[in-house]
């Protein structure tokens, strides 16, 4: 970390250009351009919660890369560690059929962000941030990125939050489970969704069993996210507690809801809030995010989250 650099939290991952359509991709003729990706969604949400957050990544030395940096900066994200790279900026297209079922097409193979490695961690504030948010998607996009995630978990002196965020298009259950096993002993919190992530990586779907398995891997605490069922929060040997979900006032698109949860949770931890308060804030932010289209279509502010919390 360079002298004089002060951040509350760091997010490591790949931002993406988003092309969204209001109909199936096979029929779409017009797309809306925006920016998303789990790392960007979480970073923008954390900034909206008042955290000083840095996004560590690489974007292409192209116009989309420049626009991504500008988009993040305009939303309060510290972009000094968004390096320009000769690889292309990753992108995806998303459309929906009449029933609302979404379909995605990704264009990220060999992207600038996939060229990240441990050296990107070493040039960043990871070692000094209060909270470092890491994800399984980042680890899945290349071997060097998986090395970067593992290195960041070991390098961080603050609290590591890890979201396995399993994607079968990017990796295998075995490879994703291996990253979880390596990162969990360094994680203050593992956030894992059930049954999606837990079934693939742990072979478990019962929330208490999932929490126990992650604690046994070495995680300090575990947040098992259950959609409308809320969150099961487990810390050490204490009795797990259920944190209820907040009903969404409007459901437009579920894209990025989990990222909103993770980014808000990490931001509240970085500002010194308790884990339970941070999880409640994350559930509130996720419910608000459902009202917007795309990963960054509706980003909850701290005032909005506090209004939901009451």
What positions do the PLM features span?
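Glycine-rich phosphate/adenosyl-contacting loop at the front of the ribokinase-like
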Residues: 1-78, 250-251
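Conserved phosphate-binding/catalytic region of the ribokinase-like
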Residues: 2-10, 203-310
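Ribokinase/PfkB-type carbohydrate-kinase core domain
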Residues: 2-11, 73, 79, 98-240, ...
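Short, glycine/acidic-enriched loop or turn micro-motifs at the edges of active sites
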Residues: 17, 21, 61, 166-168, ...
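Alpha-helical segments flanking ligand/cofactor-binding loops in enzyme cores
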Residues: 44, 69-70, 181, 212, ...
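Hydrophobic residues at beta-strand termini and immediately following loops
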Residues: 56, 82, 243-244
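Acidic, glycine-rich active-site loops and adjacent beta-strand->loop/helix elements
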Residues: 58-64, 87, 110-112, 166
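A glycine-rich helix N-cap at a beta->alpha junction
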Residues: 70-89, 97
